[in-house]
């Protein structure tokens, strides 16, 4: 399988402008993500997709291939599709790698790549939800699965409701999973999902992947044991360094 890894990187950010270029222990966040992605032996190529010349020039400084995309896209999926087309090459799958996880585990990328078997249309990662607080956090997206580990639904609410059990104990009575936001797309499916219009469920939950489910596409889910540590604000830098044991 030929698999392309794409790292979207935008300079504009409401909460953290210039985020991809911030310094983290001597390297930019973008370079750290890129270096981690390159450690995955299952990716054929890795490119950075950006709409900003400052990011493009920086990426070239550490010899990364860059695809310049237009500034406005409805979603990261659309940006990934444009970047894929700009390579001028054919790939079987495209994996969208979050550009704000400087210490992403290459094993997570491999885990996703391993289920890209030609039959899988779309794929993503999930991690067990083992606490009441995380389970009921509406910022955490939960996944409901069928017996083939394909997503039935993604929601900010808790699904299923467990009748007759105190909600503080629900996580002890059912295997709940939350979403870890990295996606793999079969190339032909990526083209199709970018043609879809926003759907009612997507608009209600503000979750793009519900558009795919509503239109009959299947999303395979693989369980990871490694949590993701995103940087969304300047304060997150210190938090992530402490979580990774890189700062006391």
Report each predicted region and the residues it spans.
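Conserved core of the sugar-phosphate nucleotidyltransferase
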Residues: 104-196
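Short, high-confidence coil segments that cap the C-terminus of an alpha-helix
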Residues: 43, 89-91, 118-121, 217
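A residue-level structural signature of the nucleotidyltransferase/glycosyltransferase Rossmann-like core
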Residues: 4, 47, 101, 142, ...
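Hydrophobic/aromatic residues located in beta-strands of well-ordered beta-sheets
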Residues: 5, 46-48, 94, 123, ...
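N-terminal glycine-rich phosphate-binding loop and ensuing alpha1 helix
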Residues: 2-49
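Short phosphate-binding loop-to-helix
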Residues: 47, 53-111
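Conserved alpha/beta core of the MobA/IspD/sugar-nucleotide pyrophosphorylase nucleotidyltransferase superfamily
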Residues: 89, 170-248
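A conserved hydrophobic position in a structured secondary element of the catalytic/binding core
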Residues: 50-51, 104, 185, 232
